[in-house]
Amino acid sequence: LGSKGTKKFEIPTRIPNVTFEIPPSWGGYQPVSLRHDKARQLYFWMFPATGKVGHDDLVVWFNGGPGCSSLTGVLTEEGPVKFNNVTHKAEPNPYSWTNLTNMIWVDQPAGTGFSRGQPKNQSMEQIAEEFNGFLLSLYQTFPKLQGKRLWLAGESLSLIHI
């Protein structure tokens, strides 16, 4: 999914206090618009498919909200790293959705989790417009994502704007 131009988004495969290497991934900020409002940026963390299938698909995951960080999903539910509630340690997640598809977790709308900028949205339509701008920006930064089948998934209130 990465290319020469996406190197600055690469996440190290070694993370402090995690005793194993995580799969290659990319994370960072993308603006909600290609033309203006660069101050409002959504945070994302993206992992490529690791299995034999799913390389032509891209699933974007949203945790509840609006206003719930999707990092909860990547670190406690569908991601390749899962934090154990008993041992309080990170461990590989054998049931990660990355076994089946390319995955992106997004903190949205702006102002949620690690995303930047003041929340301005007054409606679900405005949240969708902001996400669309983010997605166009992401496709521009990661051209290998263009042409992949896009799937939107989530839980709780996120299902209203999916």
Which stretches of residues belong to each language-model region?
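Hydrophobic alpha-helical cores of multi-pass transmembrane domains in eukaryotic membrane proteins
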Residues: 105, 156-158
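Aromatic-acidic/polar surface patches that form glycan- and anion
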Residues: 19, 36-37, 124-127, 155
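Conserved small/polar residues in nucleotide/adenosyl-binding loops
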Residues: 160-162
